[in-house]
């Protein structure tokens, strides 16, 4: 019962870190990155579909992304979706593919993005702590119902705290890495 609660908590914490990693990857760093477009969707025959499923995305140069739709009739829709996104880029359509030049970030914009990265990191840490809280409640329930002894639950709580600290540290490292990327000129 205790092992099950700890395993479940660790699995959920792992997912929270993965979500944080994905969220941070969508923040533009001033360098071309296919991940920038991972959350942009277009209306594809009535269904919201990710651009990554409708086109190949390549980075031939440090500040250039080339998007080649699998279907030529989707060029205009993809271009419009990118233009309307919050990426702050201006795509150009040459009839066969879309080129997106990634502009240099201003110092002000870098600071803004660092704040955004820290906020996303904080949200992820709150998520991990909530998972810990729920697991602690489960451990207290196990103790109360007599399914495990006081010592067993105490050890499990220490293990849970150690695991929580490990995942919070991972999130801090992800944010620190992203901050370094953003502030690098």
Curated annotation (Swiss-Prot):
GO molecular function, one term: ribosomal large subunit binding
Entry keyword set: Cytoplasm, Protein biosynthesis
Single Gene Ontology BP annotation: translational termination
Gene Ontology CC terms: cytoplasm
InterPro entries for this protein: Ribosome_recyc_fac, Ribosome_recyc_fac_dom, RRF_sf
Compartments, as annotated in UniProt: Cytoplasm
Entry keyword annotation includes Translocase: no
PANTHER family: MITOCHONDRIAL RIBOSOME RECYCLING FACTOR PSEUDO 1, RIBOSOME RECYCLING FACTOR
HAMAP family: RRF
Membership in a protein family: Belongs to the RRF family.
NCBIfam families according to UniProt: frr
Function of the molecule: Responsible for the release of ribosomes from messenger RNA at the termination of protein biosynthesis. May increase the efficiency of translation by recycling ribosomes from one round of translation to another.
Name of protein: Ribosome-recycling factor
Record organism: Mycobacterium bovis (strain BCG / Pasteur 1173P2)
Underlying gene: frr
């Amino acid at each position: 019962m205790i092992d099950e609660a700890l395993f479940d908590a660790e699995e959920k914490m792992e997912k929270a870190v993965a979500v944080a990693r994905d969220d941070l990857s969508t923040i533009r760093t001033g360098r071309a990155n296919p991940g920038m477009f991972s959350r942009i969707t277009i209306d594809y025959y009535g269904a919201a579909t990710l651009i990554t499923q409708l086109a190949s995305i390549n980075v031939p140069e440090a500040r250039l992304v080339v998007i080649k739709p699998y279907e030529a009739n989707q060029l205009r829709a993809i271009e419009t979706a990118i233009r309307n996104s919050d990426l702050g880029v201006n795509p150009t359509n040459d009839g066969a593919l879309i080129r997106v030049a990634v502009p240099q970030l201003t110092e002000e914009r870098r600071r803004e993005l660092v704040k955004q990265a820290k906020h996303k990191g904080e949200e992820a840490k709150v998520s991990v702590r909530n998972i810990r809280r729920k697991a602690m409640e489960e451990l207290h329930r196990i103790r109360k119902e007599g399914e495990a002894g006081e010592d067993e639950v105490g050890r499990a709580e220490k293990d849970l705290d150690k695991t929580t600290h490990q995942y919070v540290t991972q999130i801090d490292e992800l944010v620190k890495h992203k901050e370094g990327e953003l502030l690098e000129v």
